[in-house]
Amino acid sequence: MEHFHQIQQTIQHYQQQLAAQQQQQVQQQQLQQHQVVVQQNQQQAHQNSSNTTAGVGTQQLFTYKMASSFPNPATTMAQVVATSNAAGTTGYDYRLNMAQAAAAAAVPGSQWWYSAANQGQVDANTAAQLQHQQQQQQQQQQQQQQQHQQQQQMQQQQQQQNVINSASPMSRVKADAKPRGRMTAYAYFVQTCREEHKKKHPDETVIFAEFSRKCAERWKTMVDKEKKRFHEMAEKDKQRYEAEMQNYVPPKGAVVGRGKKRKQIKDPNAPKRSLSAFFWFCNDERNKVKALNPEFGVGDIAKELGRKWSDVDPEVKQKYESMAERDKARYEREMTEYKTSGKIAMSAPSMQASMQAQAQKAALLAAAAQQQHQQLEEQHDDDDGDGDDDENQ
């Protein structure tokens, strides 16, 4: 029971961690989206500024091209025939009303209306636009990669959540707050042993079967004085359970008193169940069958015992049926004493015989299961039904 509660707490802890991680990822996504919007606004403003600057440079260049249609006196008017005035001879100089002599003295080596500063500004704007476009492409690629990674993380988390939900026993827990079942004195003893073992050996892995066996052996060797405190704990828990059940109201439509019962730790001191006449017969005849047929396995012995039991005389069968009746009366008597006092009133010989019978019963069940498994394997090997092993052909 305690192990079940620990599993529930562990699963709840994992679910809380997953919820916190998902909330952090949502916040990170919102922050990234906000940053993307800010970057887009900045890029739009920068683009508008670049377009304005490029437009001014284009207008200036267009003006210069228009001016190139006018003749330059330093290059084109050198062979012009003289006209009625000096302007017709030298042509017009459009450079800020400079004197004719100064203009003639300062002949430019190239067309004067192409400003080097303006041309450098145009080149710089073009390079800036190309660089800005490259940065935008890189940012878009990074954003796509981040979105792809986020989608993968969300899918992995969803898969983990599905696995936890499918393996979680929380889905089988009833929605109503039904009182927890009461614990026996032996269950409190096992719980105490487990806590002591965890304190002494926190890193050691506990094997449940071995641990239960040791607890049962220790419980058998304890005296009544040592068991007293566990019986007191069980009595208090019984009172708690009865008080909670009095105040418990089942949900509407619930069926009370039905359903699968919770599996509790079995008390090793509880009376052993009675054996049937067939099992008493097997106890007497098993050694004889093994002596006559030493090559027989467990399954063969079980089959032979079943055949002999079906052929046994009615008088012999009546003998074992009487033994089964006496064992049944013994079980009922010991069970009554166990329920009234919580202790076992069994003699040592009867306890030993009962334990031996239980072991033999388990051996017979295992033999029957093994026999059925062998038959299935033989049918699988002989698929064509000819009686031969297909793998050896």
UniProtKB/Swiss-Prot annotation:
Residue ranges, annotated region (Disordered): 153-179, 364-393
Origin: domain of life: Eukaryota
Gene3D superfamilies in the record: High mobility group box domain
Keyword annotations: Chromosome, DNA-binding, Nucleus, Repeat
PROSITE patterns reported for this sequence: HMG_BOX_1, HMG_BOX_2
DNA-binding region per Swiss-Prot/TrEMBL record: 179-249, 271-339
InterPro entries: HMG_box_dom, HMG_box_dom_sf, HMG_boxA_CS, HMGB
One GO CC annotation: nucleoplasm
Record's subcellular location: Nucleus; Chromosome
Composition skew (Low complexity), residue ranges: 364-374
Any Pfam family: HMG_box_2
GO BP term, example: leg disc development
Name of the protein this chain belongs to: High mobility group protein DSP1
Species of the source: Drosophila melanogaster (Fruit fly)
Name of encoding gene: Dsp1
